[in-house]
């Protein structure tokens, strides 16, 4: 599928924006980059003092997975094991942040 043919859903975009803002507020910092392709990315989690370029700790998930995790944070492990969460780096396990942010 060509990138040009993929369009953002406005309702999903608004929901993702609100969820990312909540995560950023709950876990301020710039040690982890959380990417939601087509919709946005934030840097969050205090820790390693990262200043330029891409952080060593990265998480990439779809908008649908982000919404699922906000509704049920306990899904982190199973979604990661099924490959729906791509995470790298020592600080990339955001399961606790989702659990605390979206109780």
Question: Could you say what each language-model-derived stretch is?
Answer:
Residues 1-103:
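Feature captures hydrophobic
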């Amino acid at each position: 599928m060509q990138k040009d043919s993929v369009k953002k859903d406005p309702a999903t975009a608004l929901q993702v924006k609100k969820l990312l803002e909540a995560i950023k507020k709950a876990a301020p910092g710039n040690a982890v980059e959380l990417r939601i392709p087509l919709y946005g990315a934030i840097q969050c989690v205090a820790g390693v003092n990262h200043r330029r370029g891409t952080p060593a700790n990265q998480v990439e998930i779809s908008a649908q997975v982000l919404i699922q995790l906000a509704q049920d944070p306990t899904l982190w492990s199973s979604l990661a094991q099924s490959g729906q969460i791509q995470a790298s780096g020592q600080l990339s396990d955001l399961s606790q942040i989702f659990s605390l942010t979206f109780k």
